[in-house]
């Protein structure tokens, strides 16, 4: 009996010694490298990132600074990550598994890999995929916190955008040529006020006809007093510097099919049309003209009843008992009801995703069966589709983004420094034993 107790005590002692030894090793591996407000950076995190950076550098034949300098950079990054992670928790920012999976899928696609191949590549490089996945989540949270915090500190004025647009246009305008059509409605050299008024009335009528789709060349041949009238008013291809100043100021950066005028000159009233453009990147986007009827479910109107109600409207339209416009005015909820559900011309991408998806499957003049969006239940009538020149809007967006990015880089650094200055950060010296 004594022997058994002694054996148990000895075994217990060995277990305690082993546990103590393991704990000591764990403490050595997971020693606190830094305290960041209410969080910590562990030595194991520092070492893992150091190993990962060295592996990537070796793979890319990239030289690295000394271990000491590299460790300082790694510590800075992990401290920043900890700060931003804590801020993200306070702000309620969460990255769902679905968002994370989508990001990883995009990363794999950029490397021209399937997700399974991408995962294996991470494992082959000596990193746990689960750990890699969580690191990506941390990066996404950090990015969201940074963007939310820095964005509100940046202001880009319309004047700044206009100034940059002018510079961008000057740099590219010499390469752009416009194919112009010209109609001149003459008035006498010694024109009276009546002559001027009559010429302007004729010119205004010509512009109205052109805007309604009349043939430019035909009107030029019959009405223009310009030397090129018999050529359909064709002035040929000209860049901005080759045009009369009065024309160039009005034509510059205008899209194809733009009609400018009437413009009063010494000879009469000029009407100019941009027949075509070359040498400029033209971006066209599709717009749709649609009408809809919206029914919002409520406590007294279930989803099923809302859907059934809309299907009934479609049946009435098919039977010729009512028009879409009449039903929209009577039943649709929202501001478009007074217009018979007319949404006007718009880029379909600007609508709710479910609405955009529904429009993509429709043909001109067709109706879409009832479907659910974030606003409620809809039926749609697609009136028409068209392609429009979105170059000017694209350039404006690009100019804004350039200015925003310039300011973002500087402001992000300033904001992060302020955030670190306000935080409690204690870095512990590395134990070299």
UniProtKB/Swiss-Prot annotation:
Residues 175-276, 285-384 form the PpiC domain. Keywords: Chaperone, Isomerase, Periplasm, Repeat, Rotamase, Signal. GO terms for molecular function: peptide binding; peptidyl-prolyl cis-trans isomerase activity; unfolded protein binding. It is found in: Periplasm. The PPIase activity resides only in the second parvulin domain. The N-terminal region and the C-terminal tail are necessary and sufficient for the chaperone activity of SurA. The PPIase activity is dispensable for SurA to function as a chaperone. The N-terminal region and the C-terminal tail are also required for porin recognition. This is Chaperone SurA. Chaperone involved in the correct folding and assembly of outer membrane proteins. Recognizes specific patterns of aromatic residues and the orientation of their side chains, which are found more frequently in integral outer membrane proteins. May act in both early periplasmic and late outer membrane-associated steps of protein maturation.
């Amino acid at each position: 009996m004594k022997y058994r107790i002694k054996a148990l005590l000895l075994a217990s002692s060995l277990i305690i010694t082993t546990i103590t030894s393991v704990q000591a090793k764990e403490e050595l591996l997971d020693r606190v490298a830094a305290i960041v407000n209410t969080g910590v950076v562990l030595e194991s995190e520092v070492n893992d990132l150091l190993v990962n950076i060295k592996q990537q550098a070796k793979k890319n034949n990239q030289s690295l600074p000394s271990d000491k300098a590299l460790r300082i950079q790694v510590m800075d990054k992990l401290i920043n990550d900890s700060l931003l992670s804590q801020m993200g928790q306070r702000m309620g920012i969460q990255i769902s598994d679905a968002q994370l999976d989508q990001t990883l899928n995009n990363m794999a696609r950029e490397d021209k890999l399937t997700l399974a191949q991408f995962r294996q590549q991470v494992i082959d490089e000596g990193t746990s995929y689960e750990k890699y996945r969580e690191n990506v989540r941390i990066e996404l949270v950090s990015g969201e916190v940074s963007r939310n915090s820095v964005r509100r500190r940046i202001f880009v004025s319309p004047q700044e955008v206009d100034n940059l647009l002018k510079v961008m246009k000057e740099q590219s305008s010499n390469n752009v040529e416009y194919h112009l059509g010209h109609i001149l409605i003459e008035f006498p050299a010694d024109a009276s006020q009546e002559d001027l008024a009559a010429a302007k009335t004729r010119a205004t009528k010509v512009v109205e006809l052109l805007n309604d789709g009349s043939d430019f060349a035909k009107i030029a041949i019959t009405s223009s007093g310009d030397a090129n009238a018999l050529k359909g008013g064709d002035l040929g291809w000209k860049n901005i510097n080759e045009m009369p100043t009065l024309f160039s100021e009005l034509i510059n950066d205008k899209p194809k099919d733009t009609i400018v005028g009437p413009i009063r000159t010494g000879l009469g009233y000029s009407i100019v049309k941009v027949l075509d453009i070359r040498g400029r990147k033209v971006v066209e986007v599709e717009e749709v003209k649609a009408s809809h009827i919206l029914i919002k479910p409520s406590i007294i109107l279930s989803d099923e009843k809302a859907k059934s109600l809309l299907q009934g409207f479609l049946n009435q339209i098919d039977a010729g008992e009512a028009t879409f416009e009449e039903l929209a005015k009577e039943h649709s909820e929202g501001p478009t009801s007074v217009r018979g559900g007319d949404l006007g011309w718009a880029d379909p991408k600007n609508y709710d995703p479910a609405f955009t998806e529904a429009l993509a499957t429709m043909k001109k003049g067709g109706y879409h069966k009832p479907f659910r969006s974030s606003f409620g239940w809809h039926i749609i009538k697609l009136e028409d589709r068209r392609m429009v020149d979105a170059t000017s809007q694209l350039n404006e967006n690009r100019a804004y983004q350039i200015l925003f990015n310039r300011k973002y880089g500087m402001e992000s650094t300033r904001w992060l420094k302020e955030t670190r200055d306000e935080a409690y950060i204690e870095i512990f010296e590395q134990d070299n034993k």
